[in-house]
């Protein structure tokens, strides 16, 4: 079994690509419950490893998009090679014995240097999108940063880390997907992917939006409502009408190098870009960001709030 790990920033087409991959019989690509990012820093609180396994299984059960096949705690304990969360993570994903398994927890790039994560021998799929469109999307979403400054800083950090991983990873273990290319020629992207990893190419992936997994995703919250629709090929350059002139300027000032490295042209000339921001400006941005995040949370639908509540109960209990 080989392990595909998607990396990058949310709102960049990762769920779209996951659903396309999930149409291949050889690939198991469920919606991610973000097991590692949730439990990695909590594991030190667990004196009982069995309790950690139990909580990780419960966490998957409360994932916003339901899993069809979750192994029992007993099965997990019988199949792990070591008592660590990376092994629990592996067994949960590989329970159905797929040829390839895929995790869409994009922030798992943070575990790149962990020896136990390295043992899983991940094949990184770096999916990236024009950061200004990512920012425009985050401003409307119920998750993530909300002020353009904070979104820009997060996007910058994520791209830098992913590009560092690319430099230090063997070519076979790294595959880049530019979101805009996926929109314009998905067949080319998927065909190249299949050739590289020995998959049998078929056009079934284009019907991802008709799949049961897609229907489950699109009815599970506003974040994924487009997933039950055919590919929206013009879903790019929206920032030009959705971000203000100043927001674009702030984003480009922080991300000039990363945007250009990834093949995106700037709207603003170098002479217009801010060289820095004062501590007062940054404090103001952070306060606005905090208020907007609270507002976004309050605007989540009841289904999303209830699931978050159930998950919080799991990790707030004495371990």
Name each region found by the language model.
Residues 1-5, 139, 200-319:
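PAPS-dependent sulfotransferases, especially Golgi type II membrane carbohydrate sulfotransferases
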Residues 94-207, 211-230:
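PAPS-dependent sulfotransferase catalytic domain
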Residues 15-27:
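A conserved segment at the C-terminal end of the G1
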Residues 23, 29, 35, 133, ...:
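Active-site micro-motifs of SAM-dependent methyltransferase domains
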Residues 24-31, 190, 197, 201, ...:
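A generic secondary-structure signal for well-formed alpha-helical elements
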Residues 28-110, 118:
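PAPS-dependent sulfation machinery
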Residues 9:
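P-loop (Walker A) phosphate-binding loop of NTP-binding proteins
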Residues 88-89, 158-162, 189, 247, ...:
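Alpha-helical packing segments of well-folded alpha/beta enzyme cores
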């Amino acid at each position: 079994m080989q392990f595909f790990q998607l990396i990058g920033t949310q709102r960049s087409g990762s769920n779209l690509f996951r659903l396309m991959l999930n149409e291949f019989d050889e690939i198991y690509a469920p919606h991610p419950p973000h097991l590692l990012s949730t439990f990695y820093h909590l594991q030190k609180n667990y004196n009982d490893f069995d309790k950690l396994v139990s909580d990780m299984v419960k966490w998957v059960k409360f994932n916003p998009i339901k899993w069809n096949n979750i192994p029992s705690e007993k099965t997990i304990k019988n199949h792990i090679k070591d008592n660590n969360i990376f092994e629990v993570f592996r067994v949960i994903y590989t329970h159905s014995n797929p040829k390839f398994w895929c995790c869409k927890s994009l922030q798992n790039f943070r575990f790149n240097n962990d020896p136990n994560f390295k043992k899983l021998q991940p094949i990184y799929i770096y999916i990236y999108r024009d950061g200004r469109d990512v920012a425009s999307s985050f401003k409307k979403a119920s998750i993530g940063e909300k002020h353009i400054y904070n979104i820009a800083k997060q996007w910058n950090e994520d791209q830098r880390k992913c590009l560092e991983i690319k430099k230090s990873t063997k070519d076979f273990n790294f595959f880049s997907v530019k979101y805009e290319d996926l929109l314009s020629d998905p067949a080319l992207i998927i065909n190249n992917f299949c050739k590289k990893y020995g998959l049998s190419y078929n056009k079934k992936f284009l019907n991802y939006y008709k799949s049961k997994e897609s229907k489950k995703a699109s009815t599970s919250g506003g974040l994924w409502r487009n997933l039950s629709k055919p590919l929206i090929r013009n879903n790019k350059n929206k920032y030009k009408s959705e971000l203000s002139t100043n927001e674009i300027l702030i984003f480009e000032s922080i991300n000039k190098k990363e945007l250009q490295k990834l093949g995106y042209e700037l709207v603003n000339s170098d002479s217009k870009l801010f060289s820095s921001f004062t501590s007062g400006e940054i404090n103001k941005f952070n306060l606005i960001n905090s208020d907007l995040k609270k507002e976004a949370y309050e605007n989540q639908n009841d289904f999303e709030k209830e699931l978050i509540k159930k998950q919080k109960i799991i990790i707030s209990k004495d371990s």
